[in-house]
Amino acid sequence: MQNGKIKPENLLRRSPTNRKLTTGCEILDGCLRGGISCDSLTEIVAESGCGKTQLCLQLSLCTQLPISHGGLNGSSLYLHSEFPFPFRRLHQLSHTFHQSNPSIYANYNDNPCDHVFVQNVHSVDHLFDIMPRIDGFVGNSKTRFPLKLIVLDSVAALFRSEFDNTPSDLKKRSSLFFKISGKLKQLASKFDLAIVITNQVTDLVETSDGLSGLRIGNLRYLYSSGRRVVPSLGLAWANCVNSRFFISRSDGSIVKDRSEKDENCSSSVSRSAKRRLDIVFSPYLPGSSCEFMITREGICAVQA
């Protein structure tokens, strides 16, 4: 490796990592065959309110778990690009996480929130400005929890108002997609990090050439809240990520009894809006899905 770049002839010599980051839910981990892969870019696509940020917050805490418990024994960097960061929700989840894993913090004067580093990113240029600092932060971390997870929530927000739909802007935007994903993949490979990126959806607009219905991955169509949707940023961005998970929301609710064992369900009966995670494409996962709900304690999947 020279200047942080991997030579093509060395790609086949590298041993792929098998390390996974638990989602904090045993059923959801089963769907993902252990959780989120390290040394990889994982994208979570969903409309607002489906739970993609909730899952990312939960992953940020689960990173601190020991490797024997599905964690990475590390800290996380949360890059957020829209809305105020949900500190209140993070503290709520942190309290539950601390109660469930007191031994991690018993001999230290800290708490789970101390190991979730939050950075606002307000533009593409800003993201590129802080990339060198991220590289230095990961490489020179001397804390008891080295950085092991980077979350970018969300990538679509960075491009929402900066570019028009002109050929020149679309070309420039595609180039930036590959630069961003290339740098994140470089960090993931160099430091064996898990990288999670959220993306939004737009309503499907049918076109005369039929390209709007182009199939990418395991699902022919994507539906959420009764609408047919497509991931934002198009095919160029889809080619930049290793795995894509789609979270949808539908009418109705899930009622889950406490007899279905899951640490994230505290009441005897829990009721929540119905949500579903689908694996759209992944090099290491077959197509599958899992229903879940969001409780006060976190994401709680439902056994099929």
From Swiss-Prot:
Disulfide cysteine pairs (residue numbers): none
Tissue specificity remark: Detected in various tissues. More expressed in reproductive tissues than in vegetative tissues, with the highest level in young flower buds.
Annotated Gene3D superfamilies: P-loop containing nucleotide triphosphate hydrolases
Domain of life: Eukaryota
Residues annotated to bind ATP: 46-53
InterPro entries: DNA_recomb/repair_Rad51_C (IPR013632), DNA_recomb/repair_RecA-like (IPR016467), P-loop_NTPase (IPR027417), RecA_ATP-bd (IPR020588), XRCC3-like_C (IPR047348)
Cellular-component GO terms for this entry: nucleus
Intracellular or extracellular location(s): Nucleus
UniProt key word tRNA processing: no
Expression triggers: By genotoxic stress and by DNA damage.
GO molecular function: ATP binding; ATP-dependent DNA damage sensor activity; single-stranded DNA binding
Coiled-coil blocks: none
Subunit record text: Interacts with RAD51C.
Task performed by this protein: Plays essential roles in DNA damage repair in both somatic and meiotic cells. It is important for postsynaptic events following pachytene in meiosis. It is also required for DNA cross-links repair and is involved in double strand breaks (DSBs) repair.
Protein name in UniProt: DNA repair protein XRCC3 homolog
